[in-house]
Structure formats: structure tokens, C-alpha cells
Amino acid sequence: MSQLKPQEIVRLGDIQMANHLPFVLFGGMNVLESKDLAFEIAETYVDICKRLEIPYVFKASFDKANRSSLHSFRGPGLEKGIEWLGEIKKHFNVPIITDVHEPYQAAPVAEVADIIQLPAFLSRQTDLVEAMAKTQAIINIKKAQFLSPREMNHILNKCLEAGNDKLILCERGTSFGYNNLVVDMLGFDTMKEMNVPVFFDVTHALQTPGGRADSAGGRRAQITTLARAGMATGLAGLFLEAHPDPEKAKCDGPCALRLSQLEPFLAQLKELDALVKGFKKLDTH
């Protein structure tokens, strides 16, 4: 077993991520559809987060490797995707988070991304976990839809034994029968007991996997309800995807917040986060 322990507060420049601190936003778009659209979305997030004083990290994927159909849009790929993300990082002076799907991608992605993300479906893949951990980048570990919150401790231990203690856990829903996900609110406390920052991916928790003929469906209309519920548990951060025209988004449009609603949505969550974290803790054991 590793002598390392996870960092309770994960630091990224001036950004501090911890369950007792003001929430951090991992926000952007699902997949890099085009360079122009990525810049448009990044600019909107950056401007709004500056106004609301929300610490911010831009998120987008360069490849969606688990699409329902062979013909579904996947993104620009590793080389071009890293290039675009690097340009966004430099232009807006904003940190970057993106996901890694295969071990060989970990090192080149970590040269640009400040946080590398372990996809939920791949979270038990030991070779991938080890390759990501060895980059020494911050790792955002998505909780698999088929794993309990407590089982995430095994993945944390893999990272620690590979020498990386800069770890984040991220809830994104649990499979509930066919074509449905639910969020166990008690699971947030279970993961927080592991002394790591815990985030909530409200976007993908709204999925109805396989809910359409050749793609996932979603429940955008319930995003405010679910986001409020999750953030009321007192979390380190929120993971969110938005799009100027979700009906035309090339991936997970039914789950994406309308970009025009981003500011009022985040303003409500900032107010709720401050309220919850201002409460005196009660020991109900």
C-alpha cells in the first residue's frame, strides 16, 4: 500500500478545490465541434465566471470514443484537439480539463491540460489509471455508472500507488434499470469521507443512455433541480456543459444547458453554495 494520502485541498495555481471552500466550475462543451464554437463558449464562461467570481476551468473533449453509433461525431482527434485547447488556454489565460481514453494519450494531453479526466466507463482500466497518475497532473476521476461510491476508494488507491495524490472524484449518476440514471445524494458524503474534493457532473447525470435510436437522450428541463440538490450537499465543484443551440449539438445536446441561461443558473448555485457552507456542522452520529 502507498504511504501517500490524497490531498484534501487540491491546488491549481490560485484555484483551491476542497469540499469546504467555495465551489469551482469545470465548464465548457461536450466535444470540440469547431474551433470557432469552442472559443465562443469559452469566452462566455470566462466572462460570466469573472463577474460572479467563480473559479473556473474550461472543459472540452477532443474525442468521444464511446458513441452509440459508428457514424456519430467524435471530435477533431488528439493532435488537433490538443492544439485547439492550448490556444484557448493561452488566449483566455484559463486552465484546461479534458479526458484521456488510452494510456498513450496521457503524457501528451498532460502537457496542455492542467487536469486530465478519467472517463466513467474506463475508471477500472488499470493501465490507463497508472499512465494518467504517472503524469503527475491533477486527475478528475469520474465515478462509473456501475460502481458504488465506496468502490471509488480502489481507484484512488491505484493512483496513490502510482505516485499521484492530486485526485478528485466526480459523481455522474448510477445505472437504474435500462436507459436511466439516478443520483444517490448519500453517495456524496461517502466519497467526501475519502478526504478528496468531490465534484458533481450534473450534465451527464441527466442522460438517458441509449434513450434515442442511435444516441443518448437527456432531461435538460430538470438540470436546475438536480444541480441544486447536489450542491446542497456541500461539494468542491460542479461539472457542467452548455451549448448555444443544444438541439444542434453534436453530442449530448439533450443534457446541455442553454448557453444563454448560464449566468442566472450559476448565480443561483453560487448563492446556494455560500448558504450551505455557512451552516454550522451538526454531528448526528
UniProtKB/Swiss-Prot annotation:
Pfam hit, one: DAHP_synth_1
Q: Does the keyword Transferase apply?
A: yes
**E.C. number:** 2.5.1.55
According to the lineage, what is the superkingdom? Bacteria
Q: Per the record, GO CC terms?
A: cytoplasm
Single GO BP term: keto-3-deoxy-D-manno-octulosonic acid biosynthetic process
Keywords assigned by UniProt, alphabetized: Cytoplasm, Lipopolysaccharide biosynthesis, Transferase
**EC category name:** transferase
User: SUPFAM superfamilies from the xrefs?
Assistant: Aldolase
Provide the reaction this enzyme catalyses: D-arabinose 5-phosphate + phosphoenolpyruvate + H2O = 3-deoxy-alpha-D-manno-2-octulosonate-8-phosphate + phosphate
Q: Could you state a single Gene Ontology molecular function term? A: 3-deoxy-8-phosphooctulonate synthase activity
Which pathway does it serve? Carbohydrate biosynthesis; 3-deoxy-D-manno-octulosonate biosynthesis; 3-deoxy-D-manno-octulosonate from D-ribulose 5-phosphate: step 2/3; Bacterial outer membrane biogenesis; lipopolysaccharide biosynthesis
Location within or outside the cell? Cytoplasm
Concerning its family, UniProt says: Belongs to the KdsA family.
Name listed for the protein in its UniProt record = 2-dehydro-3-deoxyphosphooctonate aldolase
Protein species of origin: Acinetobacter baylyi (strain ATCC 33305 / BD413 / ADP1)
Lineage of origin: Bacteria, Pseudomonadati, Pseudomonadota, Gammaproteobacteria, Moraxellales
